[in-house]
Amino acid sequence: MPIIDIHIHLSDIDSFHRTAIDLSKVDYSAAGLKAEFDKNDVILGIGMGVTEQTKGAFPDSSSPNPMGLDLEEKVPSFLMECVGINPNHLGGDHAQAELDRIEARLQAPEVAGIKLYAGYYHHYVYDKIYTPVYELAAKYNVPVVIHTGDTYSMNGLLKYAHPLTVDELAFQQRGVNFMICHLGDPWVMDAAEVVAKNPNVYADLSGLVVGDRPHFERFMNEPLFMDHFRRALVYSDHYEKMLFGTDWPLAPIDLYAEFVRRLVPEQHHEKVFYENAFDLFPRIKQRIEDLG
């Protein structure tokens, strides 16, 4: 079965480099990612754009818009990009210039969507500062991907990353599709309700375990941990709106795919691992066709 990994990273972020070395034990490079893709029948990935101007500064308030995948000079052919947004630069005298650069980037064929780092940046997703970004998403028919749940930085504020904030946003912006990252973990039941209630809200299952095989074995063999997520999936009962992602380099792709296969009932595997990505990200069809 072909797989589309809709949530990976390929940015020069210090914490990602350290995680790859110390925890997940992966080769954090385009070549390393491609090798894992080939080994696991992953035909396409979507990278979440993010940058830091100073080593260790993520989430960096000084990063210009849009934030991209800067570990390599250009986006590899087997990837697409969700352009990252720094809301701190969307106000003031230079806001229009920032928005103009975002819009120009959205016209690139390798761009699949927009990424908001809620919690990392201290703005609610329904804050008016993001309104022009949602207007661009509607104009170019791309989804907005939103970090929710625990932040991979002590400088994040969790109140901005709670999945219930997406409920108000989805109501305000019915013309835009949104994806809740990480199923809102640890607030997975809240995220499940937001997905079930709102026709324009999806969720990914990325980033729920970080580390190498011993980490995965520990958690996959803990019923309380697995049932934490299964309960939310069963409650939502919208497997057509759940998408596979790994959050690589936070975990090896083979281990993460095994984990999600255990979480999701087998009859829904093809939807979650492959088909649902086409529904949420309209541009991936052309990207895959271009790969031949």
Sequence positions of predicted segments:
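Short, acidic/polar
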Residues: 27-37, 91-105, 188
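Divalent metal-dependent hydrolysis catalytic cores, especially in the metallo-beta-lactamase
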Residues: 24-57, 78-86, 112-113, 118-119, ...
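Conserved, mostly hydrophobic/aromatic
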Residues: 7, 37, 68, 114, ...
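Catalytic pocket-lining loop regions of alpha/beta-barrel enzymes
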Residues: 109-113, 126-243, 291
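Mid-to-C-terminal alpha-helical segments outside catalytic/metal-binding sites
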Residues: 1-11, 15-44, 231, 235-243, ...
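Active-site beta-loop-alpha junctions enriched in small/polar residues
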Residues: 9, 50-51, 84-88, 117-121, ...
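Acidic/histidine-rich helix-loop elements
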Residues: 11-28, 53-55, 151-153, 213-218
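Active-site gating/metal-coordination segments in enzymes
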Residues: 59-160
